[in-house]
Amino acid sequence: MIDITLPLTDIHRHLDGNIRAQTILDLGRQFNIALPAQTLETLIPHVQVTSTEPDLVSFLTKLDWGVKVLASLDACRRVAFENIEDAARNGLHYVELRFSPGYMAMAHQLPIAGVVEAVIDGVRDGCNTFGVEARLIGIMSRTFGEAACLQELDALLAHRENITALDLAGDELGFPGSLFLSHFNRARDAGWHITVHAGEAAGPESIWQAIRELGAERIGHGVKAVEDRALMDFLVQQRIGIESCLTSNIQTSTVASLADHPLKTFLEHGVLASLNTDDPAVQGVDIIHEYHVAAPAAGLSREQIRQAQINGLEIAFLSDGEKRALREKVAAA
């Protein structure tokens, strides 16, 4: 189902939600951190979704063991490097990796700016080693409140030339976008792109807010947009993309089943919706699964899957020249 003549992208992929179970085991042993299991087989149920979670917040707890073992900046650098290696193994030509430096720093009180620098270094080394193109998106974890998000933003801005965009993720219902207006004003002043998790746990009004108040150029998940035809029309008119994550939306109980997922409706409506993974290690999926298994189960035709692949590059945070160069590189391969 993947068109090998086109660039394959994943533009909604959490670096801190893609820490390998083996790496969690290795780092736990290295730093003498107590883990809930001591073998790979018995650890996996603790760090990977094995059945549908009741809600988004429950799903997010599966990510916690991955960051609990980040006891040094070298550990952060390692998981960043491995994220690029995983992308290369999946055949991705271009990936946008998003990460919350405060979340990664929290368990061991690492310097947040140091975490940002370690991630930048690990991703750069990975790109040089594996030939994948990547950009970094900084996340503010809204779950920890406005002040914590300000610390994350300051750390990200200290390395602004290596960050492409700002995102807001976490507890959408408990911490609405209205709390973070000044944060996003600073991000836009820095020249960053804006993408926001919205319409995942909350309704279409959260998406409107992300666009109108925070300046979102893309929406993460955005499943509730299907409830508001005027919003879908607006997304089409303004070319605001939706970063769809099929399997993730089932595992978080955001959508009841793949057959109920609105991605097909978005594509039929002309919305620039793309296929992405979200938290591949936690979910136990990869981009190939999303194209070959999840997308057909969501009712997408072969042509719609191809359109979603095209959309992934179309709405990527790259210049027109960079997109053209990537298309030419893949076509010539």
Swiss-Prot record:
InterPro entries for this protein: A/AMP_deam_AS (IPR006650), A_deaminase (IPR028893), A_deaminase_dom (IPR001365), Ado/ade_deaminase (IPR006330), Metal_Hydrolase (IPR032466)
Keyword Hydrolase: yes
Active site feature: 200
Xref: Pfam families: A_deaminase
Site (Important for catalytic activity): 221
Residues where Zn(2+) binds: 12, 14, 197, 278
A GO cellular component annotation in the UniProt record: cytosol
Enzyme Commission number(s) of this protein: 3.5.4.4
Free-text comment on the cofactor: Binds 1 zinc ion per subunit.
Keyword Secreted: no
Requisite cofactors: Zn(2+)
Reaction(s) catalysed by this chain's protein: adenosine + H2O + H(+) = inosine + NH4(+); 2'-deoxyadenosine + H2O + H(+) = 2'-deoxyinosine + NH4(+)
Function field: Catalyzes the hydrolytic deamination of adenosine and 2-deoxyadenosine.
UniProt similarity note: Belongs to the metallo-dependent hydrolases superfamily. Adenosine and AMP deaminases family. Adenosine deaminase subfamily.
Entry protein name: Adenosine deaminase
Natural source organism: Salmonella newport (strain SL254)
Lineage: Bacteria, Pseudomonadati, Pseudomonadota, Gammaproteobacteria, Enterobacterales
Gene name tied to this protein: add
